[in-house]
Amino acid sequence: MTHKFAICLYQPDMPQNLGVIIRTAACLEFPLHIIKPLPFSMTDKRFKGAVMDYIDHCEIVNHENWDNFYLYSKKNNNRIILATTKTDNNLYEFKFKDNDIILFGKETAGVPETIHNTVNNKI
């Protein structure tokens, strides 16, 4: 199935946030990519309380690390668009394309500078 967008989370470190994003992705029918490692288990009660039963309705693609995700995106002709405060690009003027993947960094640390320098664009 071809999707207009996908969401990617880089090493999320708050289980309840991951649960809520899975619910959002399920409702919008967006695939969700998760770049590991995770500092918590999917059996964590905070995660389970936030995700409820939506995990069964979300297409989740797990990647063991950034390199695996990056190779996946190249193989599938996806642009990686980083959501960051370190850009002058205006979200509302940005020209998205089909199959873009919007990347969000860790809640507590964002993404490393090497990833900032690797992505296709920033919003």
Question: What residues fall within each predicted segment?
Answer:
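Post-transcriptional modification and biogenesis factors for structured RNAs
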Residues: 1-123
